[in-house]
């Protein structure tokens, strides 16, 4: 799918985990104009108040939209997606795509009908997620782990740090003796970044399922019906809400996403 004029797509997350979704979309649609924003000034979202998450997400997206007219927004954060989508859709007239844990495909893939959901504590406790399980995995035994530590490990890895497998194994230890567990939902956009390490800790699991490819296909479908707002060719940029601690982290993120520059948004 090629565009004569680049649509501008914003990916939004509290951290850099949403880059896993961004990469899937960019691979499918390389000719778009991409912006990525991570709200590291309020990271992580998982245990924050819902109203604060909604207010910050809306304010930041509106600020970016003023400078770079957006054609589509992807909330590349499972926790935020469970609370912010209605408010964003009320305030924007463009398509808004959320991130939903891939519970339905995991339940369909599972041969033993014993599946696991790894997500943030915020995502795990949402009624929305329990409804997904009730609607699409009612015939399965569903295990759940809510972890902030795994999010931090993924952030560290993307910024050039080492992954401590012992810490990872400790977080996943409740599942290590579950021999019938054969499908795991990576219910946070950070977790595909450490998928290989998670696989090492759970060798009995045959299927690790995330939402990235499905979101990319959804973006492609929605772009067919839009009229591009800005006709100017632009570079791909990444935004944050707080300065990063070191230049190495900045360069790692720029290189991973092939961004031209990192811009710090003032609060």
From Swiss-Prot:
Isomerase as a keyword of this entry, yes or no, is yes
Question: What are the protein's GO molecular function terms?
Answer: glutamate racemase activity
Question: What residues form the catalytic site here?
Answer: 77 (proton donor/acceptor), 188 (proton donor/acceptor)
The record's keywords, sorted A to Z, are:
Cell shape, Cell wall biogenesis/degradation, Isomerase, Peptidoglycan synthesis
GO BP terms in the entry: cell wall organization; peptidoglycan biosynthetic process; regulation of cell shape
List the catalysed reactions: L-glutamate = D-glutamate
Q: What domain of life? A: Bacteria
EC numbers, comma separated: 5.1.1.3
Residues at which substrate binds? 13-14, 45-46, 78-79, 189-190
Q: What is its pathway? A: Cell wall biogenesis; peptidoglycan biosynthesis
Q: What does this protein do?
A: Provides the (R)-glutamate required for cell wall biosynthesis.
Recorded protein name is Glutamate racemase
> What species is this protein from?
Histophilus somni (strain 129Pt)
């Amino acid at each position: 799918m090629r565009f004569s004029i680049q649509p501008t797509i914003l990916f939004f997350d509290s951290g850099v985990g949403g880059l896993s979704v961004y990469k899937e979309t960019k691979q499918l649609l390389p000719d778009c104009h991409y912006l990525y924003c991570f709200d590291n000034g309020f990271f992580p979202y998982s245990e924050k108040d819902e109203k604060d998450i909604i207010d910050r997400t809306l304010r930041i997206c509106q600020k970016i939209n003023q400078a770079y007219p957006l054609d589509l927004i992807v909330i590349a954060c499972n926790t935020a997606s469970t609370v912010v989508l209605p408010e964003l859709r009320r305030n924007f007239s463009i398509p808004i795509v959320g991130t939903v844990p891939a519970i339905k495909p995991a339940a369909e893939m599972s041969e033993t009908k014993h599946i696991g959901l790894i997500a943030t504590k915020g995502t795990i406790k949402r009624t929305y997620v329990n409804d997904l399980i009730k609607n699409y995995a009612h015939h399965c035994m569903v295990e759940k782990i809510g972890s902030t530590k795994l999010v931090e490990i993924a952030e560290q890895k993307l910024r050039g740090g080492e992954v401590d497998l012992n810490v990872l194994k400790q977080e996943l230890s409740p599942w290590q003796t579950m021999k019938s567990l054969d499908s795991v939902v990576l219910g946070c956009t950070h977790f595909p970044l450490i998928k290989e390490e998670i696989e090492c800790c759970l060798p009995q699991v045959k299927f690790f399922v995330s939402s990235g490819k499905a979101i990319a296909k959804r973006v492609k479908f929605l772009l067919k019906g839009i009229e591009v707002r800005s006709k100017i060719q632009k570079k791909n940029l990444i935004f944050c809400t707080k300065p990063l601690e070191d230049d190495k982290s900045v360069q790692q993120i720029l290189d991973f996403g092939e961004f031209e520059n990192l811009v710090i948004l003032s609060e």
